[in-house]
C-alpha cells in the first residue's frame, strides 16, 4: 500500500529554493539534502517505489505547493539525494489547502519531510491529488 509524503524543496536548509525547484521540475525528481544517517534523510531513503510525494514548503496556514509525483527510483545515495518521479504534476496553480486538521496542525515549524496519515481525514483529502 502506497504511502504519502510531503517534502520541502529547501534542500540546503537555507531558504534558497529556486535553483533546486527548477532542477526538480526539469528532471521530474525530488531532492533531499539530509543524508540517510540523519532521521529526515532516513525517511527519504526508506520511501518505496510507488509511494507518492508532494513538494511543498511552509506552515499549513500558508503552505506553498509546487508539484507531486510517484516515486519511481531508489535513492541516489549521493548528495544531493535524489529520487525520480513518474506521473509528475505541477500543482502551483491548484487550490490545495492544508489546515489545522492536517499533520502538524497550526504549528509554525514543519519538518523537511513528513508522512500524511491515512487515518487523518484532512490528510486523506490531500492524498486525493495523486
Regions picked out by a protein language model, each given a short descriptive name:
Residues 57-62:
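Short, charged beta-turn/beta-strand-edge "cap" motif at the junction between a beta-strand
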Residues 64-75:
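Short beta-strand-centered aromatic/proline hotspots
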Residues 47-48:
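Short, well-ordered loop/turn sites that connect or cap secondary structure elements
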Amino acid at each position: 500500500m502506497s504511502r504519502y509524503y510531503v517534502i520541502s524543496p529547501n534542500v540546503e536548509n537555507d531558504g534558497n529554493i529556486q535553483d533546486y525547484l527548477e532542477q526538480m521540475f526539469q528532471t521530474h525528481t525530488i531532492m533531499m539534502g539530509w543524508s540517510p544517517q540523519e532521521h529526515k534523510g532516513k525517511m527519504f531513503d526508506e520511501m518505496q517505489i510507488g509511494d507518492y510525494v508532494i513538494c511543498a514548503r511552509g506552515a499549513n496556514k500558508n503552505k506553498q505547493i509546487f508539484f507531486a509525483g510517484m516515486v519511481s527510483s531508489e535513492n541516489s545515495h549521493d548528495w544531493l539525494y535524489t529520487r525520480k518521479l513518474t506521473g509528475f504534476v505541477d500543482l502551483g496553480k491548484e487550490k490545495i489547502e492544508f489546515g489545522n486538521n492536517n499533520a502538524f496542525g497550526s504549528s509554525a515549524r514543519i519538518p523537511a519531510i513528513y508522512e500524511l496519515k491515512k487515518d487523518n481525514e484532512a490528510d486523506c483529502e490531500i492524498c486525493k491529488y495523486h
